[in-house]
Amino acid sequence: MEDFVRQCFNPMIVELAEKAMKEYGEDLKIETNKFAAICTHLEVCFMYSDFHFINEQGESIVVELDDPNALLKHRFEIIEGRDRTMAWTVVNSICNTTGAEKPKFLPDLYDYKENRFIEIGVTRREVHIYYLEKANKIKSENTHIHIFSFTGEEMATKADYTLDEESRARIKTRLFTIRQEMANRGLWDSFVSPKEAKKQLKKNLKSQELCAGLPTKVSRRTSPALRILEPMWMDSNRTAALRASFLKCPKK
C-alpha cells in the first residue's frame, strides 16, 4: 500500500500525510491504510478548492489558467493539512475577520463566498449514514458538511453542494480511479475491511520484524485528518485494540 500511495498521489500530499502521522506518533510503514486515507482526504480538500476564485464583484468564478492581471481572491481557505497550532491560528483569524462563529472541531475549509466553514468527508459506506454521524458529532448549523463516496455518491447540508457539477465530477472521478487502482493491485479489500486490514497489519509487523522496537503503550490520539477518514475502515477504539494485540513480542 505504501508504494501505491507514493505512486498515486502528489509528493506534496504525501509529505503532508507523513507529517500528520508523525505528529500523532503513527508509523506509516505499519498503518499503511491510514496513510492512504489521509492522502485521499487531503487530495479531495485540495481539489475542492482548486480553480475557485472570487472576482472584484464578489462573484464566484472558476479559472483554470492563472491571469496575472486578474484581481482574484481564492474562494476557499484550506485548513486541513496544517499542523494543529497553525490550523487553529487560521481559524481564529477567519473568525476575527469575518465574524464567523468559532467551530468546536477543526474544519477542513472556509468558504469566503458563503461565509461558512466546511467539513469534508470521504467514505466507502452509505453517504447518509456517515453524514448523520458527522452531523451528530459537530452539532453546529454553521459548519457545512459535504460527504463523498468512492462510488460516486455525495451528500451535503440542505442539499447545497457548494461547487458546480463539473468540479464535483472531477472529485468523484478521482475517487473512483483510486478505488479501481487499489482493486487492480489487490489493496481495496484490506483498505475498507477491518478483517482484511487486521491481516495486513499483522503481515506488515511480521515482515518488517519490528517487534523489538515497538512501544509498550498505544497512543489514543487521533489526527485531525483521521477524524474524517477513519470510519472508512475502522473506528479509533478498534484501531487501538488492534494495534495493541500485535504489540506483544512472541515468547522466545
Swiss-Prot record:
One of its GO terms (biological process) is viral RNA genome replication. The probable endonuclease active site in the N-terminus and the basic amino acid cluster in the C-terminus are important for the shutoff activity. The C-terminus acts as a nuclear localization signal. The C-terminus is recruited to host protein complexes involved in nuclear Pol II RNA processing. The record marks L28, L65, K202, K203, K206 as: Important for efficient shutoff activity. This is Protein PA-X. It is found in: Host cytoplasm; Host nucleus. Belongs to the influenza viruses PA-X family. Plays a major role in the shutoff of the host protein expression by cleaving mRNAs probably via an endonuclease activity. This host shutoff allows the virus to escape from the host antiviral response. Hijacks host RNA splicing machinery to selectively target host RNAs containing introns for destruction. This may explain the preferential degradation of RNAs that have undergone co- or post-transcriptional processing. It comes from Influenza A virus (strain A/Hong Kong/5/1983 H3N2). The record marks K195, K198, K199 as: Important for efficient shutoff activity and nuclear localization. GO terms for molecular function: RNA binding. Pfam families: Flu_PA. Keywords: Decay of host mRNAs by virus, Eukaryotic host gene expression shutoff by virus, Host cytoplasm, Host gene expression shutoff by virus, Host mRNA suppression by virus, Host nucleus, Host-virus interaction. The active site is at E80, D108.
